[in-house]
């Protein structure tokens, strides 16, 4: 479950998960068969099957390894010939868990941001040695492992050594992750400033405000109508991952969104950039209405793209995540 920069747990993320039975209710065998179908031809273009078609557990609001029915869910997908990819911190569970996943032949991206002396600065409450051990167990059982590395100022000097280690341990791939998480203050569970990641702190030793105040400042900035972003351009060039990849995001409570960038809990989540979505989301719980009906509101997001700016009602997260103008 996510917290804010290492501080207290975000009360906007209720603790929940999909059981194997619920998962099968949403993703029926018929839907799974359609997931693996090639993209239909357009004009003279032949039908295309993308290498990443399948189901990805991306850890948007938690870690796959926390799900009690995780292995059973993966086994269900594999039984229907669906490609499975998992992103995880990889610091939980006994050896048998990782061996079971390895024998299923799935892909797991292990988030390993440096060596033992740097990894914990961002991946708080994880044990680097345990992550490496779990990855080795998974690889030995036949799994395809990817070393996912976020470059920070504090670990860039270790990237070459990490790449060499990944190759030596049998990782199939080493991937740099560029997702904007490479800077900002980090806090303890008690909300006390711990350390700073990146280059946004002044050169003199000045601590940031306590984390609750930072969040409140962000919300005030949004609510005041002064919200601005460099990608909120007059003309948009949106590369929508939902439209391009036929992507759908299903949250752990069964609610459905066009993509993980828009995935949230509308009644409680404190992310100010998602506040306008509360008016758009309607009847989107697939456990209640089925997957197709839960997707019926998606076009209302695209309608906001015709507005002049985020201030005028454009979907903030679409602009920030997908505008290439």
Regions found by a protein language model. Give the residues of each.
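Radical SAM enzyme [4Fe-4S]-AdoMet core and its adjacent flexible, acidic
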Residues: 2-24, 29, 33-34, 38-42, ...
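Acidic donor-diphosphate engagement hotspot in glycosyltransferases and nucleotidyltransferases
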Residues: 69-70, 97
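Residues immediately within or flanking Cys/His clusters that coordinate Zn2+
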Residues: 315, 319
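Short beta-strand->alpha-helix junction loop in the catalytic core
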Residues: 90-91, 115
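Catalytic phosphate/metal-binding cores of nucleic-acid and nucleotide-processing enzymes, i.e., regions
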Residues: 54, 65, 73, 85-87, ...
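Nucleotide-activated donor-dependent transferases that construct or modify glycoconjugates
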Residues: 56-59
């Amino acid at each position: 479950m996510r917290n804010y920069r290492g501080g207290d747990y975000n009360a906007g993320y209720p603790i929940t998960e999909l059981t194997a039975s619920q998962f099968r209710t949403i993703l029926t065998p018929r839907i799974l068969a359609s997931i693996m179908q090639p993209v239909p031809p357009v004009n003279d273009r032949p039908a295309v099957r993308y290498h990443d078609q399948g189901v990805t557990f991306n850890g948007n609001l938690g870690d796959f390894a926390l799900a009690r029915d995780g292995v059973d869910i993966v086994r269900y997908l594999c039984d229907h010939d669906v490609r499975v990819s998992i992103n995880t911190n990889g610091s939980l569970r006994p050896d048998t868990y990782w061996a079971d996943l390895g024998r299923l032949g799935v892909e797991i991206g292990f988030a390993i941001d440096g060596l033992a002396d740097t990894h914990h600065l961002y991946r708080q409450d994880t044990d680097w040695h345990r992550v490496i051990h779990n990855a080795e167990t998974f690889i030995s059982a036949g799994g395809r492992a990817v070393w996912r590395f976020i470059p920070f100022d504090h670990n860039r000097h270790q990237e070459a050594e990490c790449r060499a280690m990944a190759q030596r341990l049998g990782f199939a791939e080493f991937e740099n992750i560029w997702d904007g998480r490479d800077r900002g203050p980090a806090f303890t569970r008690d909300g006390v400033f711990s350390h700073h990641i990146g280059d946004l702190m002044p050169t003199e030793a000045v601590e940031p405000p306590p984390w609750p105040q930072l969040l409140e400042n962000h919300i005030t900035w949004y609510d005041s109508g002064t919200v601005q972003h460099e990608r909120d351009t007059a003309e948009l060039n949106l590369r929508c991952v939902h439209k391009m990849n036929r992507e759908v995001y299903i949250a752990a409570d069964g609610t459905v969104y066009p993509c993980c960038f828009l995935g949230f809990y509308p009644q409680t989540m404190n992310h100010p950039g998602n506040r306008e979505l509360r008016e758009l989301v309607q009847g989107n719980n697939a456990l209640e209405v089925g997957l197709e009906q839960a997707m019926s509101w998606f076009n209302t997001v695209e309608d906001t793209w015709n507005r002049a700016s985020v201030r005028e009602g454009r979907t903030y997260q679409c602009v920030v995540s997908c505008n290439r103008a």
